[in-house]
């Protein structure tokens, strides 16, 4: 099985490195591992479809894509399986790898530029390769609901017997006795006014 980062690598060798150049691609990527949260996710082996446009700009390559995938999970109230269609737009700038500085002034300028950029926010190209993993993962996770429901008016499960409320009668209930008073339940009986 391919590592996650290898599965999302895209070779942009067809795109010339001249500002203003553009290429469009349609991709179907297979996820090597689960992407999502505990209760809902795009499962390993599922396809993620991308309609992608690469634009060459002076700093690097601007990637714009429409992502679509299918997430599987379970309803937080009734635990029924659910499917959720994910449709999300991605736009990221991948910077060209910096050229190695030759002179002292170039090294100083390169250090200042590196200090100005937050390393976590900068996506770098590796030669002609673009790693789409981080933006795809972020787009999917941000589009997933924290508490997925099978329907907005799902009633959930009866806490007493665990059966779905929607399949129970309206009069369904469980007699709950406060454990502090449970010992008195054996004393019950109709009140006898003769004694």
Name each region found by the language model.
Residues 1-195:
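Structured interface patches
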């Amino acid at each position: 099985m391919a590592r996650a980062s290898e599965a999302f690598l895209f070779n942009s060798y067809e795109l010339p490195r001249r500002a203003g150049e553009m290429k469009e691609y349609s991709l179907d990527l297979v996820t090597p591992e689960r992407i999502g949260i505990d209760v809902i996710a795009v499962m390993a082996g599922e396809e993620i479809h991308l309609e992608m446009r690469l634009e060459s700009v002076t700093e690097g390559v601007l990637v714009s894509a429409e992502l679509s995938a299918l997430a599987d999970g379970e309803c937080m109230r009734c635990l029924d399986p659910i499917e959720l269609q994910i449709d999300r737009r991605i736009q990221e700038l991948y910077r060209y790898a910096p050229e190695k500085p030759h002179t002292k002034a170039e090294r100083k300028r390169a250090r200042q530029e590196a200090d100005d950029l937050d390393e976590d926010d900068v996506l770098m190209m590796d030669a002609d390769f673009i790693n789409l993993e981080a933006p795809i993962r972020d787009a999917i996770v941000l589009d997933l609901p924290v508490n997925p429901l099978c329907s907005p008016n799902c009633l959930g499960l009866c806490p007493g017997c665990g059966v779905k409320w929607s399949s129970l009668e309206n009069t369904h209930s469980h007699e709950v006795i406060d454990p502090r008073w449970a010992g008195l339940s054996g004393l019950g009986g109709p009140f006898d006014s003769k004694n």
